Amino acid sequence: MLRVKSLLAAFALSSILLAQVPFTQGNLVVVRVGTGVAALTSAAQATFLDEYTTAGVLVQTVAMPTALSGSNLACTNAGTATSEGSLNISADSRFFTLAGYSAAPGTLAIAGTTSVLVPRVIARVGSDGVINTSTSINNVFSAGTVRSAVTDNGNQFFACGSNSGVQSATLGGTTSAAASSALPTNLRCLGIYQSQLYCSSASGTYLGVSSVGVGLPTTAQPITILPGFPTTTGPSSYDFFFADATTCYVADDRVSASGGGIQKWVLSGSTWALAYTLAPLATSTRYLSGTVIGGVVTLYATSTVATGNAILSVVDAGAGSPFTTVATTLANTALRGIRVLAARAAVSFSGTGSPTTVGIPTVGTTGGLPYLGNPAFTLTAGNMPAFNIGFMAIGLGLVQSVGIPVPGAPASFNLYVNPIANTVLLITDALGNATLPLGLPSTSAMAGLPLAVQVISYDGLMLDPLPLGASIAMQILLGQW
């Protein structure tokens, strides 16, 4: 029988051993453009990541390269292009990503350059502080701003800007391929939630948050606005934050009297509806992040003041919730994209299953997402022979991208969990189902730890030397919410 507490203690220990990193879990990381020495202009400006505590204490500043250094390119942003400087963080909190230009500070009218002469750059900054700006794009985004970049694994990236739609690029590459087809091509921010790529736009009839294809596109896929979001003139949507699958917050940079602020959208049935807008006094918001802890949503945003702007926070207690100023930057600098350094709980699936005489076994979860402190989280197995045995193979790490054949098992049998940390015996009920409770403690050091799971089913009616069937693989990411 699985000793859940021992397993989780091992997870915590492995995290603690790797926890000596420059960025601290739970802190805010924000893009800053400019040094403060001179007024911001349309020329390229030095770009930084500033780390703050949620109480507004500046912890450190990490400078992006301003010149070629080894394989790392310069990564700068236009001083007055407020749509540039979006920041993202991978679901496992390992990598921050932002986009910029391979140009020295002071390069005039940087957004008007061609990408052949001035490649657009994707910066990947690890939570360990390692900067990688070796990824460039020289075939699109010419004569326009490059705005946002996002990754799910640190090797494959998506980027967008004022033209060219969504593009996909590979770490260290110099070109990109289209990941979106047709309109819109003028996009603002990208994000990944539960392994689905999303974008925001204020172009044409795409005036809110849209999905890009299904999952993470490998070819050009259509952009589809989420049902219920506006399709007529008015909204000016930028960054967005999914608190859960049915709640999405969107930063709108219009003045509050025109609907600007942080909009709360709620999914009802198959349609999204605007619940209310949280509006700060005397300013608006453009970039947005947040946390959900114990059911309480706390949002962090950067204000729309041109320079010397602020980080704002608000706890969503309903319409009219007050904002607090967390920190203010220097004159002649601008804060843009913002993210909370915190892993998000996620579950995804991959691979192919192998049938028994009753079909392909299933693997899944109940009790909500695998967030730390969730006592109800449970692994499930199904579609196995009734009143029989099976196994839950569990590994600490990523699911194998290529399955491993097992001698004696059917030709279709592939194992995706390797190495296996624990094999748990399952006994199925009359419906061929079994469950494995896996309550998660509130141990923040475990945030971001991956768990690979696969169900193995025994079937004595099969003729193979090893009469086994297998589910597809399930990847679990332990998160803070």
Q: Where are the regions a protein language model picked out?
A:
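Short, conserved, GDST-rich strand-edge loop motifs in beta-rich repeat architectures
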Residues: 26-41, 98-117, 205-210, 311
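Blade-level signature of beta-propeller repeat domains, shared across WD40, Kelch, NHL, RCC1
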Residues: 304-344
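Beta-propeller blade signature
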Residues: 45-54, 113-128, 263-265
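Signature of short aromatic-glycine-proline-rich micro-motifs recurring in repeat-based ectodomains
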Residues: 45, 71-99, 140-157, 162-163, ...
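Loop/turn-rich, solvent-exposed surfaces of beta-rich toroidal or solenoidal domains
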Residues: 234-311
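N-proximal, solvent-exposed segments at the start of the mature chain
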Residues: 343-481
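Surface-exposed loop and turn segments in beta-propeller and other repeat-based domains
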Residues: 58-79, 123-144, 215-234, 276-284, ...
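Structural motif
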Residues: 44-46, 107-108, 119, 164-170, ...
